[in-house]
Amino acid sequence: MDIGRAVRFLRKRQGWTQQQLADFSHTSKSNISNLENGNQGYSPAILEYLAKAFNCSVSQIFLLAENMDNEGNLLKDWQHMPIDVLFIQLPQEVQCQLKHLIFTLIDTKK
């Protein structure tokens, strides 16, 4: 499992540069680069900042990492992946739209 590959995958899905992710997660660009390339470990604090930047949980980042191969590609057919892994792959604006749609559907069922 490589957290760095998952971080790179999520960053690119958001269309962010390493500098933008560094700014969002209160760290330096070099730390992001080192993490993505496997040259540096990660602390619980940086994982929390990254999760907040990606609008997900730390456990979702780990889930994504578990479902990636050595090249950063998803291993499983998307139909068999946990919904959390699928959801965090979406850009944040799409995540917000889906959340709104889900809440609207829930409200109409009341």
UniProtKB/Swiss-Prot annotation:
Residue range(s) of DNA binding per entry:
18-37
Q: Which UniProt keywords apply?
A: DNA-binding, Repressor, Transcription, Transcription regulation
Q: Which domain of life is it from?
A: Bacteria
UniProt xrefs under PROSITE patterns: HTH_CROC1 (PS50943)
> What parts of the sequence cross the membrane?
none
Which SUPFAM superfamilies did the record assign?
A: lambda repressor-like DNA-binding domains
**Single Gene Ontology MF annotation:** DNA binding
The HTH cro/C1-type domain sits at 7-61
What the record says about disrupting the gene is:
Deletion of the gene results in a 100-fold reduction in transformation.
Function of the protein = Represses transcription of the PilB-specific inhibitory protein CpiA.
What's the protein here called?
Competence pilus inhibition repressor
Organism encoding this protein: Acinetobacter baylyi (strain ATCC 33305 / BD413 / ADP1)
